[in-house]
Amino acid sequence: AEITGLPSLGDDSGLEVESLDGAPGIFSARYAGKKGNDSLNNQKLLKEISLKKNRSAKFVSILSFLDPELKNPFFSYGELFGKIIDSPKGKGGFGYDPIFQVKNSNLTLAEISKTERMRISHRTMSTLKMITLLKESKIY
């Protein structure tokens, strides 16, 4: 916003595993290193959590919106709760989806439909909250 002079929207999302003190967190995409990929990230996470009893995890998305003509930014937050399973299941999605089992479900994100993934997504939640904030502000 400062550089372009235009309103800007930013997203920071990641996976937080309770027994790993919130890791991988903001490093989710680079968890296995700079040359890592989804498969290597999943392998590293599964290795680190292998001896842990608590496998609770959540996907988190935080959006920030700033209009350079306004003084205060808007922030919204979305979460999707679940747990990390022992091995990958499913072919859909990306990232940690094959090892993330959605709370109150027997399915991983990689096993559910794209439509359902989008409906329950942490990013969808934070986006809907942002839309509400902007509408309620009566600025947009």
Language-model features: where?
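Anionic-ligand binding patches
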Residues: 1-140
